């Protein structure tokens, strides 16, 4: 089987064989949110998609370092502060907490989480170096702009002509060209600011990610990701200013996830159809939401509807139900004989596992990979639950474990938390206490013996019983 990983590179718009700058190490930067409002289900898709990509690369033996920034100073934050009359720091802290809570619930792991306001010194240094190399200039207002004409490859990533970029008229007069973009924005009364060689001001949007990505991953790394809406102007401008500074290729693969639509319409405030991620998680649960995000290839739009989430919920429950059968068969132990039909099942399971990896290796195609997992689930219900074959159950268990390592929707099936374990033991001990009060000592003694075999010792007293691990 060919398990070489191929990735669709937005730069060049084609599939390319995956390779890393450093052996067995993947360095990945994904653009995070601007924390001026609740993150929504569109953000959630990006978080989960790149988490699944990271998980699969780890499953394949790579060490992955994933950086995802938090933009905590921006025009939108300042506007929100002025509209509601609250300090911008208060707004940032509140919505950062919501964002981090959503990541935790979705089981999305970020290795480094830099905030823009903690990297102002590095941003100023980055801008100054661009000025020194002739790629940026200081305007009379104290703003600093990137001179797009000094970077000949501008537009390659987004397939956009610089002359067609309409940024509005406010700052056009002080620019060399209308398509130049701000690296540093001069201070206006009532806005937060930091001191710089060019006067009071704050960073532009694009310079933040260039600075923080190179700060933590170096001047050459493997994957730069984000939503498709960031390709232009954000990622185009990031690439221009960074490659202008370092003088060579910056990122190997540009990877972008497609939009979430609501009944075929794009989410927008004007349509009033934006769904906060916290509301979706509250209604559907993080595992169902994760599963639903990954039912579609990350480069294809995914449409949100009640029906789609119900289908995802049912499909995930069927996988979990198959795990109950698998565990039950495994608990019975090996039978020490194998039938021809059992061997056929082994081959089917292994073929589907191989197909799962083939799909995931082909541009992280979670949708196709998922279809092979459901083939294994079908075998569990149609064959394994009747044959009670130990080895078949073990193979199915291992396959679903690898599936979960990527999809992250069944952790409780494979890695029960101590909290859940304690609750189960407490419940058993409480039932045993009630049996003792009913003088059903034979049953209560049997429970004590079985718990002891499992490493849990019951401590009986006159009024009640407690427990401890052996």
Swiss-Prot record:
Q: Which organism is it from?
A: Saccharolobus solfataricus (strain ATCC 35092 / DSM 1617 / JCM 11322 / P2)
What is the first-listed, main subcellular location in coarse terms? cytoplasm
Please report the name of this protein according to its UniProt entry. Answer: Cysteine--tRNA ligase
Q: Give the taxonomic lineage as stored in the record.
A: Archaea, Thermoproteota, Thermoprotei, Sulfolobales, Sulfolobaceae
Ligase is among the record's keywords: yes
GO cellular component entries: cytoplasm
Q: Which SUPFAM superfamilies match?
A: Anticodon-binding domain of a subclass of class I aminoacyl-tRNA synthetases, Nucleotidylyl transferase
State the PANTHER family in the record.
CYSTEINE--TRNA LIGASE, CYTOPLASMIC, CYSTEINYL-TRNA SYNTHETASE
Instruction: Motif 'KMSKS' region — list its residue ranges.
Output: 266-270
Q: Which residues bind ATP?
A: 269
UniProt lists the family membership as follows: Belongs to the class-I aminoacyl-tRNA synthetase family.
């Amino acid at each position: 089987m060919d398990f070489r990983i191929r990735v669709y590179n937005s730069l060049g718009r084609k599939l390319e064989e995956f390779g890393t700058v450093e052996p067995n190490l993947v360095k990945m930067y994904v653009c995070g949110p601007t924390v001026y409002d609740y993150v929504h289900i569109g953000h959630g898709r990006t978080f989960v998609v790149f988490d699944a990509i990271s998980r699969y690369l780890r499953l394949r033996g790579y060490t992955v370092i994933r950086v995802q920034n938090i933009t905590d100073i921006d025009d939108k934050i300042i506007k929100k502060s002025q509209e509601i009359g609250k300090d911008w720091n208060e707004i940032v802290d509140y919505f950062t907490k919501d964002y981090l809570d959503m990541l935790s619930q979705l089981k999305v792991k970020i290795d480094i989480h830099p905030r823009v306001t903690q990297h102002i010194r590095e941003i100023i240094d980055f801008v100054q170096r661009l000025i020194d190399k002739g790629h940026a200039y200081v305007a009379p207002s104290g703003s600093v702009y990137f001179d797009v004409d000094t970077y000949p490859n501008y537009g390659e990533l987004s397939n956009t002509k610089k002359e067609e970029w309409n940024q509005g008229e406010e700052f056009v007069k002080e620019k060399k060209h209308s398509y130049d973009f701000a690296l540093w924005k001069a201070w206006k009364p009532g806005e937060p600011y930091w001191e710089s060689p060019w006067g009071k001001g704050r960073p532009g949007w694009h310079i933040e990610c260039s600075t923080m990505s190179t700060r933590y991953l170096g001047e050459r790394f493997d994957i730069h990701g984000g939503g498709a809406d960031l390709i232009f102007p954000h990622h185009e401008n990031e690439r221009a200013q960074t490659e202008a500074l370092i003088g060579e290729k910056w990122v190997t693969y540009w990877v972008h996830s497609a939009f979430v639509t609501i009944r075929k319409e794009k989410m927008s405030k004007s349509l009033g159809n934006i769904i906060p991620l916290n509301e979706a998680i509250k209604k559907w649960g993080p595992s169902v939401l994760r599963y639903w995000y990954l039912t579609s290839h990350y480069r294809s739009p995914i449409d949100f509807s009640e029906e789609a989430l119900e289908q995802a919920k049912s499909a995930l429950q069927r996988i979990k139900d198959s795990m109950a059968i698998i565990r039950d068969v495994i608990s019975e132990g090996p039978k020490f004989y194998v039938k021809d039909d059992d061997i056929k099942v082994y081959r089917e399971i292994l073929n589907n596992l191989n197909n799962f990896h083939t799909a995931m290796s082909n541009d992280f195609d979670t949708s196709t990979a998922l279809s092979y997992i459901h083939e294994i689930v079908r075998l569990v219900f149609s064959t394994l639950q009747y044959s009670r074959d130990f080895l078949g159950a073990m193979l199915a268990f291992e396959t679903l474990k690898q599936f979960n390592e990527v999809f992250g929707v069944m952790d409780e099936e494979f890695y029960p938390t101590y909290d859940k374990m304690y609750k189960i033991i407490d419940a058993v001990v409480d039932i045993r206490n009630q049996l003792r009060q009913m003088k059903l000592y034979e049953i209560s003694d049997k429970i004590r013996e079985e718990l002891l075999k499992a490493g849990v010792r019951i401590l009986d007293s006159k009024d009640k019983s407690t427990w401890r691990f052996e």
